[in-house]
């Protein structure tokens, strides 16, 4: 899961998105964002320790508010977020040690619930039998055919089977045919009588 371009203008602009950062000095206060894990192709790979998601391109600092780079990418599952930092000029990613903390300004974070699906509103209940739509006309839960069609099967004349004529089989066989394998048994059964 990548958070780039999230809903409502993610990390690359758009309505409510991040604006281009202009050099304005360090923020009044920085908060911990995550821990350095390792470097990869000249960038810092870090694990987030914050419950919120950082903006793309947000400036990253040390605890003393000296800027070391900017967020390049955010990835991973919702409950274990990672991010990469593109170091500023003169900063070498391999010079950091595992567990070193990185910080950012608190106004460069997005609440996690912005990325979670909204709960569905409960609508009026559908009339009985409306779930299968016009395809189930006349049958008892069947997918096609009228009164003489299938009664729960996917095709043919089966009464609960997936195809063919058996009363509960996966395929083939009339009522008087073979009852072995997956074909026989009670209506809607899967095992049959051997």
Curated annotation (Swiss-Prot):
Non-catalytic component of the H/ACA small nucleolar ribonucleoprotein (H/ACA snoRNP), which catalyzes pseudouridylation of rRNA and is required for ribosome biogenesis. This involves the isomerization of uridine such that the ribose is subsequently attached to C5, instead of the normal N1. Pseudouridine ('psi') residues may serve to stabilize the conformation of rRNAs. The H/ACA snoRNP complex also mediates pseudouridylation of other types of RNAs. The H/ACA snoRNP complex mediates pseudouridylation at position 93 in U2 snRNA. Transmembrane segments: none annotated. Its main location: nucleus. Keywords: Nucleus, Repeat, Ribonucleoprotein, Ribosome biogenesis, RNA-binding, rRNA processing. This is H/ACA ribonucleoprotein complex subunit gar1. InterPro entries: Gar1/Naf1_Cbf5-bd_sf, H/ACA_rnp_Gar1/Naf1, Transl_B-barrel_sf. Component of the small nucleolar ribonucleoprotein particles containing H/ACA-type snoRNAs (H/ACA snoRNPs). It comes from the Eukaryota. It comes from Schizosaccharomyces pombe (strain 972 / ATCC 24843). GO terms for molecular function: box H/ACA snoRNA binding. Residues 137-194 are annotated as: RGG-box 2. It holds the Pfam family Gar1.
């Amino acid at each position: 899961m990548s958070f780039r371009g999230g809903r409502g203008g993610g990390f690359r602009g758009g309505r409510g998105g991040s604006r281009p950062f202009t050099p304005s000095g360090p923020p009044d206060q920085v908060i911990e964002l995550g821990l350095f894990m390792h470097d990869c192709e000249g960038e810092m790979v870090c694990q987030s320790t914050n419950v919120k998601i950082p903006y793309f391109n947000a400036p990253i600092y040390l605890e003393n508010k000296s800027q070391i780079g900017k967020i390049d990418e955010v990835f991973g599952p919702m409950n274990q977020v990672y991010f990469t930092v593109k170091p500023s000029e003169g900063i070498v990613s391999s010079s950091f040690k595992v567990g070193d903390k990185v910080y950012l300004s608190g106004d460069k974070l997005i609440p996690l619930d912005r990325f979670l699906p909204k709960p569905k509103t409960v609508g009026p209940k559908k009339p009985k039998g409306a779930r299968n739509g016009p395809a189930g006309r006349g049958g008892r839960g069947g997918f096609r055919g009228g009164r003489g069609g299938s009664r729960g099967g996917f095709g043919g004349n089966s009464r609960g089977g997936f195809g063919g004529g058996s009363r509960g089989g996966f395929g083939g066989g009339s009522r008087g045919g073979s009852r072995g394998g997956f074909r026989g048994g009670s209506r809607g059964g899967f095992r049959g009588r051997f």
